[in-house]
Amino acid sequence: MITCRLFLWFVVYTVLQSDHIIQGKRVVLMPMPTPSHTKYMTHVAQALAQQGHEVWLTMPDYLVKRSFLDTTNFTIIELTAFPNYEEILMEGLAERYFNYQTEDLLVFCRAGREFCDRILKNKHIFEQIKTLRPDFFVLDNLAFVKMLAIIPYRLGVPFAYLGSSYDVTTQRIPIVPCNIPHVMTGFNHHTTFYQRIVNFVLHLYPSLIDQCVYQDAVSRYAPEMPYLPIDILIARADIWLVETDHILDYPKPTMPNVKLIGGTATGPGKPLPPQFKDFMDEAQEGVVIVTFGSQVLNLPKSITQKILNVLTDLPFKSIFRANVSSPNSQKILTSSWIPQNDLLAHPNTRVFVSHCGKNGQYEALYHAVPVVATPLFADQFYNAERMRVRGFSETVDINTVSTDELRTTIVKWRPTRATSRPSQKPPNYSK
């Protein structure tokens, strides 16, 4: 099948086939101010730059300072003095999960509105972008930041939406709401009557009450422009590029201007840094990679100790992404940063214990590494369930799972040395 690298070129090709972009142009990308969304956009920025376009990408200073992304070939528009939205979101989501509290999904809307408000009211940022004389904008398609479409509207420049959101309301997709699993549930495509009611309500609610945007956003932030309700402006996007596909996800209807491009951020592994390479090469019995994402590095002590107890007892090595010290550095490598895709590409990687973010999920699929899913919040439960349905993972609740159960689950999904793949390990569909 077509490779994920070709999928990435398809994204670029699709964007550039717009009537507005034929030759080398000036493109501005504006992702959600979180590591995973910014990382995804950098892959597209690199591909655009390699095609001869001039590319700029907005990034808050707290991400710029971490220097964890490859920003060669394009220019960063640094957003200074912005709150750390990564911390704000984790306080309302991950911390509530670990405290057994109900998830506060409106924290996304509040953070997104504040982020958009700061950008859209900032004259310096607008003038900086205006000076670039951009020909095209690529905006994050999450509902929380869709008001950013006001910037290209003020400049009279076309725009596209790119990201993980399959939003039937703003993308104008005709559906039977009860039949499509909503991304904020853990439902699959085989639903009970109650689950269908929940799907119906969740799909219908944003079309009635959208708490993530201001309907009068155009008059608020661009009073000099002809008034448009924000949902009408959003619908003017030239194209919607949605990071999902029918290999991993359930069948979904689309419109002609909605393209499903799942897995575009994946690709072959790069050479590992020395400390990781030596550890992986020596692990002939295999390695389990454990991570809860770039946003969850400080786990509760009880969870951390549970994981360390399991990793210590496993008959093979492990790499644990967290702000902790390893009790046995020969067997457990701990780090606050890991080259995730490159580790998953290593032949000694056996199992991936993951929170089920979109990037990691597609990387695991690309490298055919089975997953023990530990979802924490938002769409991660949906992601975990669709992997389970595809026979490519098993889900555990990291809050309640016992040490023995977690160990047994990891060992169950680990291939033996005698075979290159376990019976459960999925073939590499995405290549």
Where are these regions (language model features)?
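Cleavable N-terminal signal peptides of Sec/SRP-targeted secreted and luminal proteins
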Residues: 3-21, 387
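Residues that mark the start of a beta-strand
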Residues: 25-27, 287, 370
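Short N-terminal binding/cap micro-motifs at the start of the first secondary-structure element
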Residues: 36-39
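A donor-sugar binding/catalytic signature common to diverse glycosyltransferases
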Residues: 137-139, 336-384
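Conserved donor-nucleotide binding/catalytic region of nucleotide-linked donor-dependent transferases
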Residues: 389-394, 399, 411-428
